[in-house]
Swiss-Prot record:
Organism: Homo sapiens (Human)
Superkingdom of origin organism: Eukaryota
Full protein name: Fc receptor-like protein 3
GO cellular component, one term: microvillus membrane
Annotated membrane topology: Single-pass type I membrane protein
Motif ITIM motif 4 positions after renumbering to this chain: 720-725
Signal peptide: 1-17
Segments of skewed composition (Basic and acidic residues): 628-637
Comp. bias regions, Polar residues: 608-627
Function summary: Promotes TLR9-induced B-cell proliferation, activation and survival but inhibits antibody production and suppresses plasma cell differentiation. Enhances activation of NF-kappa-B and MAPK signaling pathways in TLR9 stimulated B-cells. Has inhibitory potentional on B-cell receptor (BCR)-mediated signaling, possibly through association with SH2 domain-containing phosphatases. Inhibits cell tyrosine phosphorylation, calcium mobilization and activation-induced cell death induced through BCR signaling.
């Protein structure tokens, strides 16, 4: 804090500069209240003379009176003022003429801090007694039954005074109250005004402060003292008889709010001035310059930056501030006794790029530097690869756009595109943003894609994105698979539909004429099949359709003709009939041979080389229930055939079915005797062969559907219904 060098001018202030002193208005008698009908004399005087020189102007309730004497008499109540040639208008004096019986009078003039005399007066004062005085409704102490009292150190407030008394009316005492009285207290001195030789002094120059006031000319003997302040700090030595304070040199620290106080030496009255703002001006700074490190203002995100602001000249404390284009508030501010200052910006970001300037201010006005551009290069962020296709699921032939974009990164940015680990190509984004690469899709384009971005500050790779290229189905081929070349009722028909190309899953639909038979979804290759147990109604045109969501493809039509007889029933019936016919033929042959043999044994029979007739009845017909044969080593005489036993050599015969129909073919080896009787029988040992054929019965109560179902259920078993058992031996073989 600088030392104050004070020069006190010991000249008391008597008047405010440039303002003429007020005229003085006096009353005679010196009471401001009188009874109605009485007269009061008004006297106008100036400071230099007891009476006014020249014309005197009188005003009653602000209206100019025609009287121009320095002394007048009045009988009307109101506010009176006067003015002379060498003075300004006096303060107003209110004179009251009361019609009341009791009045309260105050001595005039009365100034702030004076002791004032109050007098309670009745029209017939001799018959008035027991007077009491009140202030604001409260009785004043020691004021009972007094003709007059003194009120000490009055002030300019709104206090109301009145008095009460008893009036003698014949033999009665009547209490009477006066009207309230507001004492007209005049200012002892005016409110002070602080004046400075300059409100904006130059730093280092002197300044004079004056606390101006005006003492009432009617109280020239009153002594005043003065004190000056800056903000809340007392200047100089405190209270002084001089209203002036001279400061040899003003500095910026002396800027602030100034005010002063004036009081009587008795401390009875004190008044304060309004505040005045004084700012000390410095030698202005010049040639402000901004420098940036690293030199040139080229930075990479994450580096530190230093902004250096300097001035070529300027005095005192300088306030430096740094600013960026587009920001309202400054980046920083420093105040110091120096010609330069630095601002450190740590870990610069992309938002720190732009134009900068600095300002220097030493309480005069800020001086700005030139603009400097700062460039912050941003390494690319991890790019994001996105696919842009005409539809949600890409299809062969679609034009796919691969878009790679880094949300952060200084341009230019070079983007490279990859399928699996193979480079597809690259594209540059000169002004930032993303880049695209187009592909016309084939099935081979399915797989993982990625991209990377590089702006020279380090490449960044995207996450892999998987692409599945969907292949539309080709035209399907419908194949009919039946047990035989000709489809018959009861066959199990397989409809097989297959598209050789197309992405899975594929939904296959099967149609008979225009009716939908059903559908099957295939999640892998090989097509799909649909089975039908055929009836005559299944003849007609068949087709199928393949669809994987990219458009259905229809097969060519295949025609099927179903014949009316069931394949199983026809086979079994034919086998039964064939077996029966063969059995009859064998029996007939056996009978002929037997007859031939008997004919040869009879006298006169046929010779071995001749042909003789024989009766078929002479040959014994074998039993149809148990087949047998003759051992050729036995005697040849005729005897009954021994019963035949079958060897247990049955295979693939369905014993569980209760409805088989069997046919039996068997041959008999005869003895010599039998051979002679049955010449047509074979003479050599032969194996007896038995053919079994199962013929299914048709149930009368079966519907067409049930019959078809039965046929399908036993379709595989029917394939084993035609079997041969190799041998059946005669009992004699054992």
């Amino acid at each position: 804090m600088l030392l104050w060098l004070l020069l006190l001018i010991l000249t008391p202030g008597r008047e405010q500069s440039g303002v003429a002193p007020k005229a003085v208005l006096l009353l005679n008698p010196p009471w401001s209240t009188a009874f109605k009908g009485e007269k009061v004399a008004l006297i106008c005087s100036s400071i230099s003379h007891s009476l006014a020189q020249g014309d005197t102007y009188w005003y009653h309730d602000e209206k100019l009176l025609k009287i121009k004497h320095d002394k007048i008499q009045i009988t009307e109540p109101g506010n009176y003022q006067c003015k002379t040639r060498g003075s300004s208008l006096s303060d107003a004096v209110h004179v009251e003429f009361s019609p009341d019986w009791l009045i309260l009078q105050a001595l005039h003039p009365v100034f702030e801090g004076d002791n004032v005399i109050l007098r309670c007066q009745g029209k017939d004062n001799k018959n008035t007694h027991q007077k009491v005085y009140y202030k604001d409704g409260k009785q004043l102490p020691n004021s009972y039954n007094l003709e007059k009292i003194t009120v000490n150190s009055v002030s300019r407030d709104n206090s109301k005074y009145h008095c009460t008394a008893y009036r003698k009316f014949y033999i009665l005492d009547i209490e009477v109250t006066s009207k309230p009285l507001n004492i007209q207290v005049q200012e002892l001195f005016l409110h002070p005004v602080l004046r400075a030789s300059s409100s904006t002094p130059i730093e280092g120059s002197p300044m004079t402060l004056t606390c101006e006031t005006q003492l009432s000319p009617q109280r020239p003997d009153v002594q005043l003292q003065f004190s000056l302040f800056r903000d809340s700090q007392t200047l100089g030595l405190g209270w002084s008889r001089s209203p002036r304070l001279q400061i040899p040199a003003m500095w910026t620290e002396d800027s602030g709010s100034y005010w002063c106080e004036v009081e009587t030496v008795t401390h009875s009255i004190k008044k304060r001035s309004l505040r005045s703002q004084i700012r000390v001006q410095r030698v202005p700074v010049s040639n402000v310059n901004l420098e940036i490190r690293p030199t040139g203002g080229q930075l990479i995100e994450g580096e530190n930056m230093v902004l250096i602001c300097s001035v070529a000249q300027g005095s005192g404390t300088v306030t430096f501030s740094w600013h960026k284009e587009g920001r309202v508030r400054s980046l920083g501010r420093k105040t110091q006794r120096s010609l330069l200052a630095e601002l450190h910006v740590l870990t610069v970001k992309e938002s720190d790029a732009g134009r900068y300037y600095c300002a220097a201010d030493n309480v005069h006005s800020p001086i700005l530097s030139t603009w400097i551009r700062v460039t912050v290069r941003i390494p690319v962020s991890h790019p994001v690869l996105t696919f842009r296709a005409p539809r949600a699921h890409t299809v062969v032939g679609d034009l796919l756009e691969l878009h790679c974009e880094s949300l952060r990164g200084s341009p230019p940015i070079l983007y490279r595109f990859y399928h699996e680990d193979v480079t597809l190509g690259n594209s540059s984004a000169p002004s930032g943003g993303g880049a695209s690469f187009n592909l016309s899709l084939t099935a081979e384009h399915s797989g993982n894609y990625s991209c990377d971005a590089d702006n020279g500050l380090g490449a960044q790779h995207s996450h892999g994105v998987s692409l599945r290229v969907t292949v539309p189905v080709s035209r399907p081929v419908l194949t009919l698979r039946a047990p035989g070349a000709q489809a018959v009722v009861g066959d199990l028909l397989e409809l097989h539909c297959e598209s050789l190309r197309g992405s899975f899953p594929i939904l296959y639909w099967f149609y008979h004429e225009d009716d939908t038979l059903g559908n099957i979804s295939a999640h892998s290759g090989g097509g799909a099949s649909f089975n039908l147990s055929l009836t005559t109604e299944h003849s007609g045109n068949y087709s199928c359709e393949a669809d994987n969501g990219l458009g259905a493809q229809h097969s060519k039509v295949v025609t099927l003709n179903v014949t009316g007889t069931s394949r199983n029933r026809t086979g079994l019936t034919a086998a039964g009939i064939t077996g029966l016919v063969l059995s009859i033929l064998v029996l007939a042959a056996a009978a002929a041979l037997l007859h031939y043999a008997r004919a040869r044994r009879k006298p006169g029979g046929l010779s071995a080389t001749g042909t003789s007739s024989h009766s078929p009845s002479e040959c014994q017909e074998p039993s149809s229930s148990r087949p047998s044969r003759i051992d050729p080593q036995e005697p040849t005489h005729s005897k009954p055939l021994a019963p035949m036993e079958l060897e247990p050599m049955y295979s693939n015969v369905n014993p569980g079915d209760s409805n088989p129909i069997y046919s039996q073919i068997w041959s008999i080896q005869h003895t010599k005797e039998n051979s002679a009787n049955c010449p047509m029988m074979h003479q050599e040992h032969e194996e007896l062969t038995v053919l079994y054929s199962e013929l299914k019965k048709t149930h009368p109560d079966d519907s067409a559907g049930e019959a078809s179902s039965r046929g399908r259920a036993h379709e595989e078993d029917d394939e084993e219904n035609y079997e041969n058992v190799p041998r059946v031996l005669l009992a004699s073989d054992h």
